[in-house]
Structures are given as structure tokens and as C-alpha cells.
Regions:
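Cytosolic juxtamembrane helix and N-cap/initiation of the first transmembrane helix
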Residues: 1-23, 46-47, 132
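Juxtamembrane helix-break-helix junctions at the cytosolic face
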Residues: 9, 65-87
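Hydrophobic alpha-helical transmembrane segments of polytopic
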Residues: 9-19, 55-58, 84-88, 111, ...
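Hydrophobic transmembrane helix segments
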Residues: 18-58
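Aromatic-anchored segments of alpha-helical transmembrane domains
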Residues: 20-25, 87-98
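Short juxtamembrane and helix-loop transition motifs at transmembrane-helix boundaries
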Residues: 40-50, 70-80, 98-102
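Membrane-helix boundary connector in multi-pass membrane proteins
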Residues: 92-112, 128-131
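Membrane-water interface at the C-terminal end of transmembrane alpha helices
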Residues: 118-133
Length: 133
């Protein structure tokens, strides 16, 4: 089994999309606990649970698209969409989280590393298969 087979964009899109979709469902179901986990128990206001639930709901649509792309697209189109998903995830989620949450005591460093790493692997899988093999 070579690297190209392991880095199949279909599996990466469906796998990452499904995992993050599941995590988003938990965020919608228990926004209060998500807020406590992210902001700290002594730093959670009444409205923070709703913010976390809406953030998770918003992310559900993004990660559902990852799954749909992985299932429906093929060949070169799948590789291109995988690279585009990787780039947009890196820019908006990783850079956005670093810039927007840096001063607010929101500890997102581990989340940034996980999302950044997964996004980078997603981009590599698309690049390795860019010829549509």
C-alpha cells in the first residue's frame, strides 16, 4: 500500500467530515458543557451556551458538505475540492481562531493544532491525487 492509497481524498473527506459532524452534534446537544470546557466554569455567562450551540450548528453544515463531497465527487474534481476545503479550513478556522480568540482567554491551542493538522493532511491527500487517478 503506497502513500497515495493511504491519502485517498474520499476517505479523508468522509472520515474528517463524519468525525467533526459527530462532535458538532454533541456541541448542539450540550452547549453549556461545551462552554464550560472552552471558557472555564468561572467564565461562563448565561448566553455562552447558546453561542456554543449556534457555533456547533453552523459547523454541522460545513462538515456535512465534507461528507457529501467525499461521497459524491470523483477523480480530479474530488482532489480539487479536497484541496479547497483544506485551504479554507486552514484560513478561516485556524487563522481565524488564532486571531479572534487570542486576547479573550479562550484556550483553543489544542483545537487549532488538531484542526490545522487534519486540514493539512486533507490538503496533502488532494494534492497527491490531483491528476484524478
Amino acid at each position: 500500500m503506497d502513500v497515495k492509497e493511504i491519502m485517498n481524498p474520499k476517505y479523508w473527506m468522509v472520515g474528517i467530515g463524519s468525525l467533526m459532524l459527530l462532535m458538532s452534534v454533541f456541541g448542539v446537544m450540550d452547549g453549556e458543557q461545551m462552554a464550560v470546557d472552552m471558557w472555564g466554569a468561572d467564565n461562563v455567562a448565561e448566553h455562552d451556551a447558546e453561542y456554543e450551540e449556534m457555533w456547533a450548528l453552523n459547523m454541522m453544515s460545513l462538515f456535512a458538505m465534507f461528507v457529501f463531497i467525499g461521497v459524491l465527487a470523483k477523480g480530479k474534481t474530488l482532489a480539487q475540492l479536497t484541496m479547497a476545503a483544506s485551504a479554507s479550513s486552514l484560513v478561516f478556522l485556524v487563522v481565524g481562531m488564532m486571531v479572534l480568540t487570542g486576547d479573550s482567554e479562550y484556550d483553543s491551542s489544542s483545537l487549532i493544532i488538531i484542526i490545522g493538522g487534519a486540514s493539512a493532511l486533507l490538503g496533502i491527500s488532494g494534492f497527491l491525487n490531483k491528476d484524478g487517478d
